[in-house]
Regions:
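Glycine-centered hinge/linker elements that transmit conformational signals in sensory
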Residues: 200-203, 240-244, 254-288, 319, ...
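Extracytoplasmic/periplasmic substrate-recognition and gating elements
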Residues: 81, 279-280, 318-381
Length: 465
């Protein structure tokens, strides 16, 4: 099902009535005709449709907030009539694909980097709109602007950012009588540099079987693990994500834009992940995870000591009562890499009203109420203190080291692990299949598997677009 919210007003009316109705996917009527400017010659407001469902924004607690904000926008902007269409996330991509040829919306989002790249050829270049609207680029870090550059087009404005860092279960550290991991870049752990090898050694001490033996013990039973020292959850089986977390920035696409590759640091990172599951047993396999949490939310079980996940994960850890966050370690390339998720909204180039659509986009990206509802760290720097203050109130009495989040923003993966690829949809699916194989199959020659995957990806890249 999808949900469309329209705010109806009569001409000259100050108030607005809200009507919500449900309709089956694919049965929407045509969008109302709109004039090519933000104020029609007839005095009628320009119609703009905002399509939500390709990322966050569909949770039950988020929808009323989005509805209220759209109603407020329409009250404050008599020249634009904004319609909010909310589609279940499981159906949104297919629903939009069916609409694109004849009845596309104007604005899509929130949508992540991976999703936005899939629409790259159909997105409006925002460069001129950004300049004409006087958007202050200095309020957002340069590295975040670069994320939304595609083939010379600025396809989005940084809106919501979600750096990755380590969430850790303080109770499990206390049980093991181990110090907590560092919350400052450059800080050592027990006299050792904070590297992935240090994390591995720590995770071995935190991984415990049902008899209480840690993974360093000769009596450790990997068939009956009770607590795992490490995880990197919610990656959509994407081996590019695992390679980036443990290996650093890289790209599956060569500099020529058409050659498939797997950089050496990515190979090292993926080997770390694979060995962590099948050799060291410090990371849960797919079968082990399914046994404790079929939905994949491993940290929330209380049985994961350290978990690499993003800022948005504050949505989903009610099951752990005492936790904090730590900085990521340096990788095999000698640098820290915080795998970045980022949401924005984009304008489809089929819009008949680009000026009005950009006015809406600019309102969405700066709306603190929406950003808080989405659990989104604002890309605009001066909005962040209020965001973290709200989180402190939410998680009282915990005193979370939120400075970690802003520190990790300084180490994004550039290029993004979710960046554009030739034949994006097919290549993305192949990556997921490869990731699933690694997650479920022991005893593989990983480097040979990577070679075979690169060969497969090259074949996909070479297919006519």
């Amino acid at each position: 099902m999808h949900r469309r919210i329209r705010t109806h007003r009569s001409l000259g009316a100050i108030g607005a009535g809200l009507m919500i109705f449900l309709a089956a996917c694919g049965t929407q009527g045509s969008s109302p005709e709109a004039s090519p400017s933000a104020s029609s010659g007839t005095g009628e407001p320009v119609e703009i449709e905002w399509y939500v469902g390709l990322g966050t924004g569909t949770n039950p607690e988020q929808i009323p907030i989005e509805e209220e904000q759209v109603e407020a926008f329409n009250t404050d902007h008599p020249n634009i009539h904004l319609t909010l269409t909310i589609v279940d996330s499981e159906e949104a991509e297919g629903n939009l694909a069916r609409r694109m040829p004849t009845n596309p919306p104007d604005i899509i989002g929130p949508i992540g980097i991976r999703g936005l790249q899939g629409f790259g050829d159909t997105l409006l270049d925002l460069t001129e709109s950004i300049e004409s609207a006087g958007v202050d680029r200095s309020t957002i870090e340069d590295a975040l602007w670069d994320v939304y550059q595609l083939d010379g087009k600025q396809i989005g404005i940084p809106m919501a950012v979600y750096p990755a860092f380590i969430y850790y279960n303080k109770a499990l550290f206390d049980e093991a009588d181990l110090p907590y991991p560092p919350d400052e870049v450059g800080e050592q752990y027990e006299g050792a540099d904070w590297t992935w090898e240090t994390v591995r050694e720590l995770a071995l001490q935190l991984t415990v079987d049902s008899s209480g033996n840690d993974a360093n013990s000769p009596d450790f039973d990997p068939a009956s693990i009770d607590v795992w020292g490490l995880d990197a959850q919610f990656t959509n089986n994407d081996p590019r994500a695992w390679s980036t977390i443990f290996g650093g920035s890289g790209s599956i696409v060569g500099d020529d834009g058409s050659t498939a590759q797997w950089p050496d640091n990515w190979r090292d990172g993926l080997q770390f992940f694979y060995d962590g599951m099948w050799t060291d047993h410090i990371i849960p396999t797919k079968a082990e995870l399914d046994a404790i949490e079929p939905d994949g939310n491993s940290f929330n079980t209380g049985r994961i000591a350290m978990d690499v996940v993003h800022q948005w994960y504050t949505c989903c850890l009610a099951g752990v009562s005492d936790w904090d966050v730590a900085v990521l370690p340096t990788g095999p390339d000698g640098t820290i890499t915080s795998k970045l998720h980022a949401d924005t909204v984009g304008i489809l180039d089929t819009t008949e009203n680009p000026e009005a659509a950009f006015e809406v986009l600019n309102w969405i990206r700066q709306n603190p109420t929406l950003l808080q509802a989405w659990g989104a760290l604002p890309a605009v720097v001066d909005q962040r203190d209020a965001f973290f203050a709200a989180l402190d109130e939410q998680f009282t009495p915990l005193e979370v080291a939120w400075s970690v989040s802003t520190l990790m923003l300084g180490y994004p993966d550039v290029p993004s692990h979710e960046a554009s690829m030739p034949n994006f949809v097919e290549a993305n699916a192949a990556n997921g299949e490869f990731g699933s194989r690694l997650w479920t199959t022991p005893g593989l020659d990983l480097q040979a598997e990577v070679d075979a995957h690169v060969e497969r990806i090259q074949g996909i890249f070479d297919e006519p677009g």
